[in-house]
A protein has these predicted regions:
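Short, acidic/polar
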Residues: 41-58, 124-132, 227-236
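Active-site-proximal loop/turn and secondary-structure-junction residues that shape catalytic pockets
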Residues: 28-30, 72-76, 98-103, 146-150, ...
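N-terminal small/glycine-rich loop or linker at the start of catalytic domains
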Residues: 20-39, 100-114, 146-152
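Glycine-rich, aromatic-flanked loop segments that form ligand/cofactor-binding clefts
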Residues: 19-29, 72-102, 133
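Histidine-acidic metal/acid-base catalytic patches
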Residues: 1-29, 37-40, 56, 154, ...
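Catalytic domains of carbohydrate-active enzymes, especially glycoside hydrolases
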Residues: 15-24, 28, 41-74
């Protein structure tokens, strides 16, 4: 395939690319690390306000990251109205509020699934607090990821833990406003090693179906066993109208939270192909595209710029798949021809097309180069001196 230009895209595909947005995680800008060490970065934000300043920088140079996810209590402030105004003044909306029931001593044996009713009540109360914060900042979604599970057979009743989870989720869901939704994330292991209470998309889906139409599944690309066909899961959840959001990242071994597309760009393309094929890239599709990453070694803002442009490149390639040729090859059972159509799109260099798109939007065609030349990193390194840098509370 020759190098395409923006004009080679059909008007609908061009519009989808122009309106694509990706939500950034506030915690990606703070100091983070592995279970062995949290590494520090000069100029790391010290509070949620400075995190939002950094989010705004990514959006200023990519044009596709106008929202931020908050994590409570990492992003607790005294005045949420002030935080919302601070974000709005920088062109940033608050998209998702993430709960945290995995860093309190009381949650040693679980949170929403804990056998102790008092601890379950505490975990539910935290989610109700998150819903209040959603109202204050105008966030439409509550995202729940649970570390709940067991390490040894016999430690607790698997069935009873599911019953407790269903009851806890029902209480949280009932507290949502009519314009708010709940998205439930799954992870196949870690930190629980015998069984995890929400280990897979089927478990998340079962609970969401029981809750109601405003409960949907979050798919974190790093939360699967090696070799899992993630695009198959994407297709199934889209068929059912229950794919609520992505947490994009990359992994080599487990939940590595590396830059999306770094380990397997072909997988990212295959995922975005299912999104495009199902019409789920449209802004009103109900699918929220988010990043969930920790930049342990690299600079935070450049890492998020690279991540956003990686998703954008995979999307552009998916939009270039020749659907007519693909359908024709499938209709006659021409396996290699169908695969060729697919691979041709993946192997296309879409960087010139995206540079053209950015120029048409008044942006620099090379967002990474432009950001590094802006002097912002040097400025925050000199200005953000004193105080405690934001982190993940580990």
């Amino acid at each position: 395939m020759t190098t395409p230009s923006l004009a080679d895209l059909p008007p609908q595909s061009r519009s989808l690319l122009q309106t694509q947005t990706i939500e950034l995680p506030s915690w990606a800008f703070g100091n983070s690390g592995t279970r062995f060490r949290v590494f520090t970065t000069a100029g790391a934000p010290r509070d949620p306000f400075e995190k939002i300043d950094d989010v705004a920088q990514v959006n200023a140079f990519t044009g596709i990251t106008p929202r931020v996810s908050l994590h409570i209590p990492w992003d607790k402030v005294d005045d949420y109205d002030r935080l919302r105004r601070h974000a709005e003044e920088r062109g940033i909306g608050i998209g998702t509020v993430n709960s945290n029931v995995f860093q309190d001593e009381d949650y040693k044996l679980g949170s929403l699934c804990n056998p102790d009713e008092k601890i379950r009540a505490k975990a539910i109360a935290h989610h109700l607090e998150c819903i209040d914060i959603m109202r204050a900042v105008g966030a439409p979604a509550l995202k729940i990821w649970l570390a709940d599970g067991t390490n040894y057979p016999g430690q607790d009743s698997i069935r009873e833990r599911q019953d407790r989870l269903a009851d806890s989720l029902a209480q949280i869901y009932a507290a949502l406003d009519s314009d708010q939704r709940l998205v439930l994330e799954y992870k196949f292991f870690e930190p629980a090693f015998y069984h995890t209470d929400v280990p897979d998309w089927g478990t998340s889906l079962v609970h969401c179906l029981a809750l109601g139409e405003r409960a949907k599944v979050v798919l974190d690309t790093g939360h699967h066993a090696p070799g899992t066909n993630i695009e198959f899961i994407v297709a199934q959840l889209l068929r059912l109208g229950r794919l609520g959001a992505f947490d994009f990242n990359s992994r080599f071994y487990a939940d590595d939270d590396l830059i999306v597309g770094a380990a397997d760009p072909y997988q990212l393309f295959r995922i975005m192909n299912e999104i495009v094929d199902a019409g789920a890239l449209a802004p009103d599709s109900g699918v929220n595209f988010m990043l969930d990453q920790c930049h342990n070694l690299e600079e935070k803002i450049p890492g998020e710029i690279r991540s956003a442009t990686n998703v954008q490149e995979a999307t552009a390639k998916a939009l270039l798949v020749d659907r007519e040729a693909l359908s024709a090859a499938r209709a006659v059972g021409d396996v290699l021809a169908a695969n060729d159509v697919f691979v041709d799109a993946f192997n296309t260099d879409v960087r010139p097309l995206l540079a053209e798109l950015r120029e048409s939007q008044g942006l620099d065609p090379d967002p990474m180069r432009a950001f590094l030349a802006s002097g912002y990193l040097e400025r925050i390194r000199s200005e953000r001196v004193g105080g405690d840098a934001a982190g993940w509370g580990a």
